[in-house]
């Protein structure tokens, strides 16, 4: 490839890093060019190459390491073939791990030389893997961690539809808002196969080389089959690759000289020499890859991709399993013969990373980047091991113990089951308590990791739910298995065996004190079995261990918050499955903030009282001069105001005792009194949750002040954000019911979530002991009992009897489950776990598809896509078959026959199975669900917060610089594909939209869509919001038809995850209607306003202000659609509502009144001049009416307040209409008006941060 191509591609890839590095690497004053280059600015260097194109230019930063430059070279299209090389400057080799600033004399326009290195066996294997990926010869990988289509994005196929719609009518022209959901919406589209460059590249049957040839530098033997049908045997040698004389029957790895000797340092170059068609095919492959957005194919590095719950069935063309001999060889190619290359000492890596310096910004960036990558690698490795443990593939260290008590070590990770195998939690609820405890432990460790306390260490921890089992994977803490001397405790701080023995150690006090202060934990006394007092900084359950490496480890962090005392003391609370019901950290934080604001208020009041008292006592006369007096007054005023602003909060302290009500017995009166005070504080916190937090959330949702949850996941996130535990679903459902029809949507969602979670607990109990080959049968049968009882009231589990004989000890009790018993058990579980009573016929009103989706996500199921039948009328019609001849349908024409019986001629002899909703074959796969303890980047968050504050203070330039720096930090630390980065893209796109930089907003919103799809799921609530925002920004940029395609896709997703009539869909329908008006599609626009009105009336009632606002818009839409009579009627309705709700003096009432008068006059004149109107209608073609009625609105995120979504400025200025009435009336009457808005000069969109990973920047 030409040099220019290489340069161009690279310059495309790096503008983001250019902008960013300048910001990250010091906000230096603008000094001389040279000094800036040396201080971390960007500069260009050239790289001299041994082959074509012989030289390339690369943009670098002095803060980059040499290995980053290497990576840039490896990824450029002109230099793909190099993997084994080093760089030289001035004839000296440069170390890969030094920063460029440390390379002597290196400056702008310097030339470094790429020198090819001899291969080692590992380098040769890596080179082979890379070239296979590069030329598209690698087949599909079967992965036990990532399921089918993991990391799928539909953005490109939706965008392709948008591009097509630009040429024809808009995408909502025939859209049916009330139609049932189509599952095709969330499936990958069929794509044309990629150009094939070679038939295969694999290891040869002669591999590995024998000893005597290894001595001569032979590393591997490969076999390459070209598109021309020839097969070549290739030797991988230390010097490169060459074609050898081997055949399938004869071994001779010496170079082949006939017709000529073919060798090259890179396998890519060698293939291009032996296959004439390779170069053309390879260029075509690159071209077709470049048509996709780079982000959609970018490999995951710091996150586990999302595995969709619905995938194409095995029979479809999308996931065809193809022959690939190298698939089974890949683990050898990647990790060597003995797999030792991938073994890592996880614990040592975690702790040494924690000990890295964090003084400078560069130190922190390097440390957090390493931390993020390490956690991602560990989470993936631990999850893979957990899957093997669950499947019984790993031998236990203690095989004689009971199954639940067995422990395992695999890949240097220690595994145990999240069950009470040794009776630790016997008094707390056994297995149920243990299961909850390990989940809470991960949350506790995550919180401590986030605090990043110097000198306090946590083990790497992951919890994996798979096939009904919960497995904990931890890095091995040095000394945890060490047998201590007699009299020594296994634990150095906290409760040793339960709470009977308590250990204390002076070394732990200072670090535990820092942790407890940050987590609002109170230092308190506990007593051992001998009633001896010990003062602990944390809960007695939280343990400190002094590792043999000298580090202080904190373990068992499941009790960093107090028990929810009120929950445990409710009537019938002893039936609750466990006693591990603790408060959430978010609630403790909210309670602390609430108490603090009370303290500040009281302090201000106290000061005012003191001041007022002092002023009363002042003598009336004053001896000072007037001048002095006035000076003092002004001084006093400023002091007074600053006094009110600044309240010293060091006097405020609030910390909760986590061991309250958990069996501690204080001894002295003083201790009892202290304990009673601690208990009161905890009770107040519990009361705060019940009397303030929960009612406030319900009220906010009732008033439409926050974004409405769409499914179980977004509901859970919303509750957790507010500090509400999932166990309060029942209480919330009661509160929601009391609010009446307005919150029906919330009540339905809460009840659906309780049913889904109850089913999950039941299914997990059965799956835990079912042999792996029968899991699909078990789940399918349970789902049929829950969702398919209408199709088949008595479903039978489908089990292969011959296979069953191999598992005499397997638990097959799931066969006995019937729809009736399952319903009874779900009712019992809901009553037990959520203290809510389901109505007697609850199963009759299930939303089948939505419930199926929620259950699939909770159990990690991947279902094959088809039109599932949950009711009898959804079943496909039966075609009577008699002896293979279709007698019944003879009069229905040939086409029908073809579709019906002729497809399967063997039907006559096959015994027909009873219809069921779900068969075992529908469950294509089960993926593990991973809970990790990865901390977020504090540095990136600090930069974002600083940028936000600067923008709020109107320091636009500084604010944008800080925000771009935060973006750079997010991408450097997390990599591009990460939920945190998706969130940031979303927030930044909003900020750019609000500052009127539309191009940048669209670019970032597009990235937000792709990264959200790939990390959170193609049909997650966040994905819907990302698409809706993208549609808004596209419309603002003038691409309204494209915007409507995105709205259509979002509406289709909404139907799948929630169903019709979601409260937030009112805003979306309004936005669609406004966009259609912009396209002058007045009839369609009117339909969407009417749909929006019907949802609004059903939710808020006919007399609400929301309804009046939509009536106001609908009246305008009717006027634009030439229905003046209808317009008058709707405007009158709007006016009457505003009048009764807001009074005659309100601005909205007055505006509606004015409109009503004008529309009424207009209607009269229209009736008089019917003929004129006919003529004027013909002139509509020349019209240029104003764009919007109410204008499009930003969609609030789930749990986000409306002003937050639209930006405070916009929220304040929102009024019914910004247009002059005359303009619209002129248009209705047929006058030729031109938009005043079009006359305004549009603000030039500010510079677009072209970020890495955009389509434009694809390499």
Curated annotation (Swiss-Prot):
Residues 612-628, 634-647 have a biased composition (Basic and acidic residues). SUPFAM superfamilies: Hypothetical protein c14orf129, hspc210, TPR-like. GO terms for molecular function: mRNA binding. GO terms for biological process: intracellular distribution of mitochondria; mitochondrion organization. The keyword Chaperone does not apply. Its main location: cytoplasm. Residues 1-27 have a biased composition (Polar residues). Residues 1-38, 612-647, 881-908, 1192-1215, 1229-1259 are annotated as: Disordered. PROSITE patterns: CLU, TPR. It is found in: Cytoplasm. Keywords: Cytoplasm, Repeat, TPR repeat. Residues 324-568 form the Clu domain. CDD domains: CLU-central. TPR repeats lie at residues 982-1015, 1024-1057, 1066-1099. HAMAP family: CLU. mRNA-binding protein involved in proper cytoplasmic distribution of mitochondria. This is Clustered mitochondria protein homolog. It comes from Aspergillus clavatus (strain ATCC 1007 / CBS 513.65 / DSM 816 / NCTC 3887 / NRRL 1 / QM 1276 / 107). The lineage of its organism: Eukaryota, Fungi, Dikarya, Ascomycota, Pezizomycotina. The gene is clu1.
């Amino acid at each position: 490839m030409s040099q220019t191509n290489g340069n161009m591609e690279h310059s495309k890839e790096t503008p983001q890093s250019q902008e960013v590095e300048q910001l990250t690497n010091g906000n230096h004053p603008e000094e001389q060019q040279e000094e800036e280059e040396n201080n971390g600015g960007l500069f260009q260097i050239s790289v001299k190459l041994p082959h074509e194109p012989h030289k390339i230019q690369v943009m670098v930063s002095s803060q980059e390491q040499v290995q980053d430059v290497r990576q840039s070279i490896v990824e450029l299209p002109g230099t793909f073939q190099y993997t084994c090389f080093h760089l030289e400057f001035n004839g000296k080799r440069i170390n890969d791990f030094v920063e460029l600033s440390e390379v002597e004399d290196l400056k702008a326009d310097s030339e470094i030389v790429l020198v090819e290195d001899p291969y080692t066996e590992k380098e040769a294997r890596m080179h082979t893997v890379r070239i296979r990926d590069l030329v598209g010869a690698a087949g599909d990988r079967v992965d036990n961690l990532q399921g089918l289509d993991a990391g799928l994005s539909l953005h490109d196929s939706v965008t392709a539809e948008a591009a097509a719609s630009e040429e024809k009518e808009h995408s909502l022209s025939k859209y049916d808002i009330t139609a049932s959901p189509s599952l095709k919406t969330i499936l990958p589209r069929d794509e044309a196969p990629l150009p094939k460059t070679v038939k295969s590249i694999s290891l040869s049957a002669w591999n590995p080389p024998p000893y005597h040839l290894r001595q001569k530098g032979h590393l591997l033997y490969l076999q390459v089959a070209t598109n021309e049908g020839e097969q070549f045997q290739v030797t991988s040698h230390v010097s490169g690759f060459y074609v050898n004389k081997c055949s399938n029957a004869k071994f001779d790895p010496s170079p082949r000289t006939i017709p000529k000797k073919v060798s090259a340092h890179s396998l890519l170059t060698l293939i291009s020499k032996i296959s004439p068609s390779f170069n053309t095919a390879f260029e075509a492959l690159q071209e077709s890859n470049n048509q996709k957005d780079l982000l959609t194919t970018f490999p995951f590095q710091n996150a586990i991709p999302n595995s969709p719950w619905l995938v194409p069935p095995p029979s479809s063309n999308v996931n065809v399993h193809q022959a690939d001999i190298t698939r089974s060889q890949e683990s050898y190619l990647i990790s060597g013969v003995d797999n030792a290359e991938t073994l890592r000492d996880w614990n040592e890596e975690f702790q040494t990373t924690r000990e890295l310096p964090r003084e400078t910004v560069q130190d922190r960036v390097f440390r957090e980047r390493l931390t993020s990558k390490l956690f991602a690698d560990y989470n993936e490795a631990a999850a893979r091991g957990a899957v093997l443990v669950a499947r019984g593939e790993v031998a236990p260290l203690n095989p004689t113990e009971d199954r639940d008590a067995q422990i395992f070590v695999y890949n240097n990770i220690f595994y145990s089951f999240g069950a009470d195998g040794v009776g630790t939690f016997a008094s707390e609820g056994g297995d149920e308590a243990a299961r909850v405890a390990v989940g809470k432990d991960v949350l506790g460790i995550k919180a401590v990791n986030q605090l990043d306390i110097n000198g306090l260490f946590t083990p790497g921890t992951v919890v994996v739910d798979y096939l009904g089992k919960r497995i904990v994977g931890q890095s091995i803490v040095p000394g945890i298995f060490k047998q201590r001397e007699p009299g020594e405790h296994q634990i150095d701080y906290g409760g040793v065996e339960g709470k009977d023995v308590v250990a204390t150690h002076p070394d732990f006090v200072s670090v535990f004190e820092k942790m407890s202060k940050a987590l609002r934990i109170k230092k308190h006394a506990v007593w051992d079995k001998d009633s001896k007092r010990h003062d602990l900084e944390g809960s007695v359950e939280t343990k400190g261990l002094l590792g043999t490496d000298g580090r202080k480890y904190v373990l068992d962090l499941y009790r960093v918050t107090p028990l929810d005392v009120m929950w445990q003391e409710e009537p019938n609370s002893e039936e609750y499955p466990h006693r591990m019901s603790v408060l959430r950290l978010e609630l403790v934080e909210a309670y602390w903030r609430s108490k603090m604001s009370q303290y500040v208020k009281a302090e201000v009041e106290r000061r005012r009282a003191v001041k007022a008292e002092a002023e009363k006592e002042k003598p009336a006369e004053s001896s000072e001069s007037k001048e002095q007096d006035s000076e003092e007054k002004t001084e006093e005023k400023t002091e007074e105001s600053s006094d009110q602003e600044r309240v010293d909060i060091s006097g405020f302290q609030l910390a909760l005792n986590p061991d309250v009500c958990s069996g501690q017995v204080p001894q002295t009166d003083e201790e009892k009194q202290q304990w009673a005070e601690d208990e009161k504080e905890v009770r107040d916190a519990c009361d705060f949750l019940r009397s303030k937090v929960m009612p406030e959330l319900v009220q906010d949702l009732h008033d439409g002040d926050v974004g409405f949850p769409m499914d179980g996941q977004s509901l859970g996130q919303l509750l957790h954000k507010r500090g509400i535990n999932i166990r309060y679903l029942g209480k919330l459902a009661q509160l929601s019911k009391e609010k009446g029809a307005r919150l029906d949507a919330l009540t339905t969602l809460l009840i659906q979530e309780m049913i889904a979670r109850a089913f999950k607990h039941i299914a997990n109990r059965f799956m835990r002991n079912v042999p792996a080959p029968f899991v699909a049968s078990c789940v399918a049968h349970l789902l049929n009992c829950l969702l398919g009882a209408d199709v088949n009231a008595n479903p039978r589990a489908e089990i292969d009897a011959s296979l069953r004989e191999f598992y005499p000890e397997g638990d097959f009790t799931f066969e006995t489950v019937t729809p009736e018993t399952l319903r009874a058990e779900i009712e019992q579980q809901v009553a037990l776990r959520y203290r809510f009573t389901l109505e007697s016929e609850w199963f009759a009103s299930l939303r089948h598809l939505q419930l199926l989706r929620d259950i699939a996500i909770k159990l990690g199921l991947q279902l094959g896509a088809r039109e599932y039948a949950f009711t009898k009328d959804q079943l496909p019609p039966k075609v009577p078959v008699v002896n293979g001849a279709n007698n019944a349908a003879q009069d229905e024409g040939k086409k029908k026959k073809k579709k019906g019986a002729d497809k399967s001629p063997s039907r006559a002899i096959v015994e027909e199975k009873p219809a069921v909703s779900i068969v075992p074959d529908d469950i294509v796969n089960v993926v593990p669900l991973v809970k990790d303890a990865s901390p977020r980047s504090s540095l990136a968050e600090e930069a974002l917060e600083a940028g936000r504050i600067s923008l709020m203070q109107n320091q636009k330039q500084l604010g944008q610089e800080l925000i771009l720096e935060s973006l750079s930090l997010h991408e450097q630390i997390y990599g591009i594909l990460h939920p945190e980065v998706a969130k940031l893209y979303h927030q930044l796109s909003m900020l750019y939209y609000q500052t009127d930089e539309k191009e940048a907003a669209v670019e970032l919103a597009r990235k937000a869509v792709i990264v959200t799809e790939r990390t959170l799921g193609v049909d997650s609530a966040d994905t819907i919001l990302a698409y809706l925002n993208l549609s808004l920004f596209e419309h603002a940029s003038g691409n309204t038809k494209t915007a409507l395609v995105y709205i259509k896709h979002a509406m289709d997703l909404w139907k799948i995850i929630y169903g019709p009539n979601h409260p937030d869909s009112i805003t979306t329908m309004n936005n669609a209607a406004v966009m259609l008006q912009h396209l002058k599609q007045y009839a369609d626009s009117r339909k969407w306003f009417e749909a929006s009105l019907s949802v609004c009336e059903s939710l808020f009632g006919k007399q609400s202000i929301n309804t009046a606002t939509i009536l106001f818009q609908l009246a305008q839409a009717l006027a634009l659609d030439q229905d003046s009579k209808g317009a008058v009627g709707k405007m009158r309705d709007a006016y009457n509502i505003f009048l009764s709700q807001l009074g005659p003096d309100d601005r909205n009432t007055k505006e509606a009144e004015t409109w009503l008068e004008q529309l009424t006059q207009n209607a009269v004149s229209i009736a008089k001049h019917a003929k004129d109107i006919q003529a004027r209608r013909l002139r509509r073609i020349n019209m240029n009416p104003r764009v919007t009625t109410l204008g499009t609105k930003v969609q609030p995120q789930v749990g986000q307040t409306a002003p937050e979504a639209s930006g405070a400025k916009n929220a304040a200025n929102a009024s019914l209409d910004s247009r002059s009435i005359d303009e619209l009336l002129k248009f209705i009457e047929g006058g030729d008006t031109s938009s005043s808005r079009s006359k305004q000069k549009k603000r030039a969109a500010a510079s677009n941060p072209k970020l890495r990973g955009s389509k434009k920047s694809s390499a």
